């Protein structure tokens, strides 16, 4: 018995729908990781504990003055973001590492790499304190990048454009403190990646990565500020507020007030302070005024934005 026209169209429609639902398109790896289960939180916690227990590297610190304006072309005259780590308060618990891993979707590593201490963590431990990229104002890593993937923002962050990275590893070789991490493994295919935070992309095999000072948080706050500014200008100059809810001093200038990093948020002892070195109202400036500041000797001449502090002047 033949199939009539209505039944034929119905069958074709069903086949088309089934194709769309069950495999007519291949999901990108990033989406697979987002939709899949991925490693458990406990696995990430266990890896951080292992990393902290293995940490043996020591810091050779030298005194420096407080970071000032950047000397790079196009630098912002009002913003230079950075951090200070209080060695008198830090107890080396490692909570900052776990918070960073979740915020930035830092993957796990295979067991043999973990046993050798080869982690992908953006925050490591040295001398019992958190250690990460110092976002140097004269960053040697940026100068040798052949594609411009390693670059400096006007606000003082040493940033990475992942899609532009060719994996030359020149930047990693030129970092005096080995703060950069290279993706030797395809963490997504190996089931080692989990997307905790939708705002940060998972990185591919062959890409370099490192601490970003939670650049996405700053970008979100800047966008919010500009949106509020546009609305305020449209209704006659209403006050513009930043992330902390406080009106900005100059209604047209974004200063990033109220923005924090994941590691700073996670520190129960308040040993990690994030802020703007060029803003006198920033907690970073207020809390470092009478402190002695230090940086690793290897980068003392590179104008780092992340410093350590201990004792008082």
Tell me what each language-model feature is.
Residues 216-313:
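Long, compositionally biased charged/polar accessory segments in the mid-to-C-terminal portions
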Residues 20-26, 149, 168-169, 271:
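Periodic small-residue-enriched repeat registers in elongated scaffold domains
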Residues 2, 22-81, 296-301, 307-313:
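C-terminal segment of N-terminal export signals and the immediately downstream linker at the start
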Residues 95-101, 170:
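Classical protein tyrosine phosphatase
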Residues 1-19:
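N-terminal secretory signal peptides and thylakoid transit peptides that target proteins
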Residues 99-102, 106, 142, 181-182, ...:
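Short, non-ligating residues that shape and space the ligands of small metal-coordination modules
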Residues 68-92, 119-173, 179-261:
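Ferredoxin-like iron-sulfur electron-transfer modules
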Residues 7, 45, 110-128:
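Extended, non-catalytic scaffold segments that flank or surround catalytic motifs
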């Amino acid at each position: 018995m033949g199939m009539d026209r209505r039944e034929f169209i119905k069958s074709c429609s069903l086949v088309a729908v089934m194709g769309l639902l069950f495999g007519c398109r291949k999901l990108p790896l990033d989406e697979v990781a987002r939709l899949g289960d991925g490693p458990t939180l406990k696995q990430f916690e266990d890896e951080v504990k292992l990393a902290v227990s293995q940490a043996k590297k020591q810091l050779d610190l030298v005194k420096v003055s407080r970071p000032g304006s950047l000397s790079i072309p196009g630098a912002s005259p009002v913003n230079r973001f950075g951090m200070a780590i209080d060695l008198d308060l830090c107890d080396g618990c490692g909570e900052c590492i776990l918070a960073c891993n979740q915020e930035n979707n830092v993957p796990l590593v295979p067991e043999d790499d973990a046993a050798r201490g080869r982690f992908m963590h953006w925050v490591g431990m040295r001398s019992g304190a958190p250690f990460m990229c110092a976002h140097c104002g004269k960053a040697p890593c940026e100068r040798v990048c052949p594609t411009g993937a390693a670059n400096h923002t006007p606000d003082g962050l040493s940033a990475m454009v992942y899609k532009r990275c060719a994996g030359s590893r020149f930047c990693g070789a030129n970092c005096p403190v080995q703060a950069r991490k290279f993706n030797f493994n395809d963490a997504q295919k190996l089931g080692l990646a989990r997307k905790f935070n939708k705002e940060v992309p998972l990185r591919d095999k062959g890409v370099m990565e490192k601490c970003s000072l939670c650049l996405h948080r700053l970008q979100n706050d800047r966008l919010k500020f500009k949106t509020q500014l546009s609305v305020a200008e449209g209704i006659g100059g209403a006050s513009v507020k930043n992330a902390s809810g406080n009106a900005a001093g100059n209604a047209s200038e974004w200063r990033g007030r109220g923005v924090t990093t994941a590691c700073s948020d996670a520190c129960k002892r308040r040993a990690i302070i994030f802020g703007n070195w060029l803003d006198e109202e920033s907690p970073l400036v207020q809390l470092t005024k009478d402190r002695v500041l230090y940086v690793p000797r290897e980068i003392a001449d590179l104008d780092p934005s992340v410093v350590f502090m201990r004792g008082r002047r």
